[in-house]
Swiss-Prot record:
PANTHER family: ARCHAETIDYLSERINE DECARBOXYLASE PROENZYME-RELATED (PTHR35809:SF1). Its EC number is 4.1.1.65. It comes from the Bacteria. Heterodimer of a large membrane-associated beta subunit and a small pyruvoyl-containing alpha subunit. It is an enzyme of class 4 (lyase). Belongs to the phosphatidylserine decarboxylase family. PSD-A subfamily. It is found in: Cell membrane. This is Phosphatidylserine decarboxylase proenzyme. Residues 220-243 are annotated as: Disordered. Is synthesized initially as an inactive proenzyme. Formation of the active enzyme involves a self-maturation process in which the active site pyruvoyl group is generated from an internal serine residue via an autocatalytic post-translational modification. Two non-identical subunits are generated from the proenzyme in this reaction, and the pyruvate is formed at the N-terminus of the alpha chain, which is derived from the carboxyl end of the proenzyme. Binds 1 pyruvoyl group covalently per subunit. Keywords: Cell membrane, Decarboxylase, Lipid biosynthesis, Lipid metabolism, Lyase, Membrane, Phospholipid biosynthesis, Phospholipid metabolism, Pyruvate, Zymogen. The active site is at 183 (schiff-base intermediate with substrate).
Amino acid sequence: MNRLYPHPIIAREGWPIIGGGLALSLLVSMCCGWWSLPFWVFTVFALQFFRDPAREIPQNPEAVLSPVDGRIVVVECARDPYRDVDALKISIFMNVFNVHSQKSPADCTVTKVVYNKGKFVNADLDKASTENERNAVLATTASGREITFVQVAGLVARRILCYTQAGAKLSRGERYGFIRFGSRVDMYLPVDAQAQVVIGDKVTGVSTVLARLPLTAPQIESEPESEPALQTAPVETAANPSAEQRQIEAAAAKIQAAVQDVLKD
């Protein structure tokens, strides 16, 4: 059970809307009969939109869970704009029929929350990640890995709700936010994370594993030390080459003289 939200069936953000729709539908039914049908349709739609069912949560410590229901629209290597590092980016688009409650993808500690004002273009488009209103949660997992998950407003969604803050500890599957009426969530994971989904896959919040993230970062191999240069033994040369040459010439002269003496005899 989520410690921040003990009623998992209907999201608390929908209680005023559902309650108002139900009261209005009953009132119109008593006064106008069948003319109340549109009000009942709206109330039923609100019930399904704000549903927030409990889900089974995988406990593999390497599993990064989908924070929301939806469809995968991006799986690529990209730049995490909040940490300025290369990352594996996975984006999930939510239509109005998906559960819009956002939950933590891993056991983590929130290090920073960054809110950016922006536009409200279709959240299915890539430019929504950089142009739309968005709220980023930067966190460090229990094993020390850094991840970023971003709530992105959509064409209809006009309000991002985030209930966490720097220093807060989130358990995997714990509810931390909500976006109304169609939106998107961008995930930025370390580059050594292994994606478990592809574009077009439909995912279920906290039940689908988006990626597997090793508990420790890969070790950067250091360059091998260069071998010391072999020292060449110095070549000894004659201390006085001219004197040696004179000795050779003198010996040659003696030999020549001896040969001449032999020939004379």
